[in-house]
């Protein structure tokens, strides 16, 4: 069960996804929160610039390895609008980050894209737990799925 604090951070991640969409990018956003509850870093998708690795979860992993101790990384939580892709899951694991809370799952995104006739991503959409065994993961969160789906629909011209 997610706390109201968890939900506040998760809503912020979805707000960042909307900011990405408004900037012409794919709608994904993420927030890194310390074990004490302090927001350490947040970002949104930036792949529209031409680098397909500019995912917010990957940015969090890179940022955290140079600014946060291993113990603090393990105690932190990453809140994200969508479940990590395999690239971001691997970066999360290698960085030693802790818990992940996501609003919508990769399986949901794949289903929506299939429904809309959008070609699949070039990388298999594996669940985070298959990439980072033993990681604490919570999601999807039903109360935010409709909003995330609407953002994805707008991006893919289906709204």
Task: Pin down the residues of each PLM region.
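A short, polar/charged loop-to-alpha-helix boundary motif
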Residues: 49-59, 63
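Conserved hydrophobic/aromatic pocket- or pore-lining residues that grip, position, or stack substrates
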Residues: 13, 29, 60
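Helix-adjacent hinge/juxtasegments
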Residues: 62-95, 99
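Short, flexible loop/turn motifs enriched in small residues
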Residues: 23-27
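Short beta->alpha transition motifs characteristic of CBS
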Residues: 40-47
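Short beta-strand scaffold segments in enzyme catalytic cores
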Residues: 28-34
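Zinc-dependent deaminase
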Residues: 1-20, 84, 93-159
């Amino acid at each position: 069960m997610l706390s109201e604090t968890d939900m506040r951070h998760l809503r912020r991640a979805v707000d960042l996804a909307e900011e990405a969409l408004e900037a012409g990018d794919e709608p994904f956003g993420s927030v890194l929160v310390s074990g004490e509850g302090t927001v350490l870093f947040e970002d949104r998708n930036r792949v529209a610039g031409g680098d397909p690795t500019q995912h917010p979860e990957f940015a969090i992993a890179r940022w955290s390895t140079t600014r946060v101790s291993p113990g603090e990384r393990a105690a932190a939580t990453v809140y994200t609008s969508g479940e990590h892709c395999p690239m971001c899951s691997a970066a999360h694991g290698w960085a030693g980050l802790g818990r992940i809370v996501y609003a919508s799952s990769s399986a949901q995104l794949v289903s929506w894209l299939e429904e809309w006739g959008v070609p699949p991503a070039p990388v298999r959409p594996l669940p985070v737990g298959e990439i980072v065994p033993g990681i604490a993961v919570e999601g999807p969160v039903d109360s935010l799925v409709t909003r995330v789906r609407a953002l994805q629909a707008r991006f893919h011209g289906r709204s």
